[in-house]
Amino acid sequence: MPAYKDNRQGTWYASFYFENWQGVKQKKLKRGFATKKDALAWEREFLLQQAADLTMTFEAFVEIYITDKKKRLRENTWSTKEHIIRTKILPYFKEKKLSEIKPRDVIAWQNEMLNYRDKNGKAYSPTYLKTLHGQLSAILNHAVRFYGLKSNAAATAGCMGSEKHKEMLFWTKEEYLKFAEVMMDKPQSYYAFEILYWCGIREGELLALTPADFDLDKGLLSITKSYQRLKGRDVITDPKTPKSVRVIQMPQFLTDEIRDYLKSIYKVQPDQRIFEVTKSYLHHEMDRGAKEAGVKRIRIHDLRHSHVSLLIEMGFSALAIADRVGHESVDITYKYAHLFPSKQQEMAQKLNMERKEG
């Protein structure tokens, strides 16, 4: 395992042959190392990776994990996972050998995450802590399932955090109408919030909409994509889940509003985004509108909860609502169970009648 000096650059490089997973011999060259030791260490880790040798460092295995998983996930999903890996997991585990990571190491890492406070003294939320642990566990589980690691130290150590989500807030119809009236001074904001409230779509789905997504003759809105801003780029991805691809019937008043809005956009093209604003813009507008209307501030996503709440109040079933908002019906039943009217009284009355008839 030799390393070579690059006399022109004053650095070291590794150059060697290896067999890839198909048994084909290939040459590998990597430049820019400060010392011979660094070059040799990199070559050693690379060869351990190729052999899937579990004495490789955790950092080396993460590169294998990235190769295996990245192409299988939506770009925005991977971006979130990668940020967690690079900033919250690798700084602690990168130098440890994969096979030597113990539950006590995971517990020590968990304690660091639990003790973290930002400059304002704020800790990580329970749901974020659970997400961090879940990502570490996913990496180690990948090693167990596909590369022969004996056990998942993160699973043995146990989880941290919880699945308790932020309080679900929503506006009543009356609150939304007050807000909407304030928004009328900015047509783009007004129509964006009209779609969010009356159709219950996600923020990314809204920002991806183009004229081609509307069939105004039939009052239909097709949800087939989502917008994300990733690393300074506008990215159009598939919707969140396969169930999210759907066609929504719009109420007639909203169909008329969208027809007017599309006519007002100068030379809009069929595939051009009709809301070329950022998520932060919508959040700012939500702040402004809630304050001026005198209604409580809710999150953009809570407009989706508000739509579901309205449909439940109108008497629609969980299945019908799920089809409209792109959820599984069991998710609607679970998340919004407290909003559905109780059938217990009706059940008791009918059972009473059955007993009397007997």
Give the label of every model feature segment:
Residues 3, 67-153, 165, 187, ...:
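N-terminal core-binding DNA-recognition domain of tyrosine site-specific recombinases/integrases
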Residues 7-13, 17-108, 263, 268-270:
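N-terminal DNA-binding module of tyrosine recombinases/phage integrases
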Residues 83, 173-177, 226-229, 251-296:
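Active-site/catalytic core of tyrosine-dependent DNA strand-transfer enzymes
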Residues 123-126, 130, 145, 149-209, ...:
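Basic, Lys/Arg- and aromatic-enriched nucleic-acid-binding interface segment
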Residues 127, 145, 194, 198, ...:
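C-terminal catalytic core of tyrosine-transesterase DNA break-rejoin enzymes
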Residues 170, 227, 280, 318, ...:
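Catalytic-site neighborhood detector that most strongly recognizes the C-terminal catalytic loop/helix
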Residues 178-182, 232-238, 338-358:
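DNA/chromatin major-groove-contacting recognition/catalytic segments
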Residues 218, 231-233, 237-245, 249-254, ...:
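C-terminal secondary-structure termini that scaffold catalytic or DNA-interacting sites
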